[in-house]
């Protein structure tokens, strides 16, 4: 008799995706982040659901409702801080996951990669709208600054911004719609993640060598289930260390001041995971130019398969490309630091240099290095 997990219509899907899935025998811990992102998403949806039970999306009561969650709701403080710091863990995993894809040439799975880029945009949009909900000073001014960027779009810009606001400034209508979108988007992300997985399972996983692993596959369970559980335990450990010891480490003190349209904070800045993009935005003195650079800094990922000039898929055996990759990582860390600094000398010039280096590395230096490495193969 055939096994139930192989015959049952629903169990069959789960079995083929997580149990009997043939996986490469040599995938390293860099392949753990996909499952960790799934865990982060589930955690965010669950904590978010419980927060939504007590939150009110109204300018008069939003800030108070968050205070009420932290003070009066049973274990409300831990739910709130798990949600806030869970977003940080989510983005750490996202950056690692994308970095892994760049290093090992996983972007050659076109559909999987492009759905992944859409997932990245959707997650960034969700995080931005979530940051607005507590209705603190940084929530309000962050929303004002970022939505205002759309006014740089020629001809329709101003109308578009007012349409998004639902009025002539960030107000009650804006907060209500942001809450609605912040609630629905994670479910869209979950659906997209399933599409992401569907496309991945059409080709099978990449591996550190970048060579086909069809000749050497092992079942996902128990080998990678146990490996994913270890990863999950480490993720939860890191998250709970943050939540229980330094819950406000990654937040902005300004967000503990209720939103006041009449008082602008001295330094408006987003959460840490957007600082690199914010630095690129600020480094261009022109509004439209800055917005374009901001969008392109993420959208450039779509071009990665086109910019791949190497005869090898992975960077494992390409020392020149490896150096440039880690230079790119250092560059992004520099820009993350700059994005959190005030707009003054020497930070302005450092930010501009970091932004130029970022685009130069991806568009010019890395493809050229790959071509040189191809030539070196003939020696």
From Swiss-Prot:
Q: Which GO terms describe its cellular component?
A: mitochondrial inner membrane; respiratory chain complex III
Co-factor binding comment: Binds 2 heme b groups non-covalently.
Q: Which InterPro entries match?
A: Cyt_b/b6_C (IPR005798), Cyt_b/b6_C_sf (IPR036150), Cyt_b/b6_N (IPR005797), Cytb/b6-like_sf (IPR027387), Cytochrome_b (IPR030689), Cytochrome_b_C_euk/bac (IPR048260), Cytochrome_b_N_euk/bac (IPR048259), Di-haem_cyt_TM (IPR016174)
UniProt binding sites for a ubiquinone: 201
What residues bind heme b b562, as annotated?
83, 182
Gene Ontology terms describing biological process: mitochondrial electron transport, ubiquinol to cytochrome c
Binding positions (heme b b566): 97, 196
Transport recorded as keyword? yes
Question: Which cellular compartments is it found in?
Answer: Mitochondrion inner membrane
Tell me if Transport is a UniProt keyword of this record.
yes
Which positions, given as ranges, span the membrane?
33-53, 77-98, 113-133, 178-198, 226-246, 288-308, 320-340, 347-367
Gene3D superfamilies, alphabetized: Cytochrome Bc1 Complex, Chain C (1.20.810.10)
Q: How does it sit in the membrane?
A: Multi-pass membrane protein
Q: What is its main location?
A: mitochondrion
Q: Name one GO molecular function term.
A: metal ion binding
Keywords (A to Z) from UniProt: Electron transport, Heme, Iron, Membrane, Metal-binding, Mitochondrion, Mitochondrion inner membrane, Respiratory chain, Transmembrane, Transmembrane helix, Transport, Ubiquinone
Entry cofactors: heme b
Report the protein's function.
Component of the ubiquinol-cytochrome c reductase complex (complex III or cytochrome b-c1 complex) that is part of the mitochondrial respiratory chain. The b-c1 complex mediates electron transfer from ubiquinol to cytochrome c. Contributes to the generation of a proton gradient across the mitochondrial membrane that is then used for ATP synthesis.
| Assembly | The cytochrome bc1 complex contains 11 subunits: 3 respiratory subunits (MT-CYB, CYC1 and UQCRFS1), 2 core proteins (UQCRC1 and UQCRC2) and 6 low-molecular weight proteins (UQCRH/QCR6, UQCRB/QCR7, UQCRQ/QCR8, UQCR10/QCR9, UQCR11/QCR10 and a cleavage product of UQCRFS1). This cytochrome bc1 complex then forms a dimer.
Q: Please give the family membership noted in the entry.
A: Belongs to the cytochrome b family.
Miscellaneous notes for this chain?
A: Heme 1 (or BL or b562) is low-potential and absorbs at about 562 nm, and heme 2 (or BH or b566) is high-potential and absorbs at about 566 nm.
Name listed for the protein in its UniProt record: Cytochrome b
């Amino acid at each position: 008799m055939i096994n139930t997990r192989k015959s049952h219509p629903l169990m069959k899907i789960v079995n083929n995706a997580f149990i009997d899935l043939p996986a490469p025998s040599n995938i390293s811990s860099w392949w753990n982040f996909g499952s960790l992102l799934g865990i982060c998403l589930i955690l965010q949806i669950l904590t978010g659901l419980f927060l939504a039970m007590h939150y009110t999306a109204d300018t008069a009561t939003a800030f108070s409702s968050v205070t009420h969650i932290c003070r009066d709701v049973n274990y409300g403080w831990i739910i709130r801080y798990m949600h806030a710091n869970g977003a940080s863990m989510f983005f750490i995993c996202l950056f690692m996951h994308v970095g892994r894809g760049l290093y090992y040439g996983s972007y050659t799975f076109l559909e999987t990669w492009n759905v992944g880029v859409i997932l990245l945009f959707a997650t960034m949009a969700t995080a931005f709208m979530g940051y607005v909900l507590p209705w603190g000073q940084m929530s309000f001014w962050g929303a004002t600054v970022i939505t205002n960027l759309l006014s740089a779009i020629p001809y329709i810009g101003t109308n578009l911004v007012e349409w998004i606001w639902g009025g002539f400034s960030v107000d009650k209508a804006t907060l209500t719609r942001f809450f609605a979108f912040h609630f629905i988007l994670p479910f869209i992300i979950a659906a997209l993640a399933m599409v992401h997985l569907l496309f991945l399972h059409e080709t099978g996983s990449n591996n550190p060598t970048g060579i086909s692993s069809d000749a050497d596959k092992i079942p996902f369970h128990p080998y990678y289930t146990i490996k994913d559980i270890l990863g999950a335990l480490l993720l939860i450990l890191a998250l709970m260390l943050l939540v229980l010891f330094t819950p406000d480490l990654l937040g902005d003190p300004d967000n503990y001041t209720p939103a006041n349209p009449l008082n602008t904070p001295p330094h408006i800045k987003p959460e840490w995971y957007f600082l690199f993009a914010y630095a690129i935005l600020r480094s261009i003195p022109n509004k439209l130019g800055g917005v374009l650079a901001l969008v392109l800094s993420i959208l450039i990922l779509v071009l990665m398969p086109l910019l791949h000039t190497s005869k090898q898929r992975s960077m494992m055996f390409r020392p020149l490309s490896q150096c440039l990759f880690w230079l790119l990582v250092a560059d992004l860390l520099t820009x993350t630091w700059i994005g959190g600094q005030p707009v003054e000398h020497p930070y302005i010039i450092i930010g501009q240099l970091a932004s130029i280096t970022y685009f130069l590395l991806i568009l010019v230096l890395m493809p050229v290095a790959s071509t040189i490495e191809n030539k070196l193969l003939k020696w």
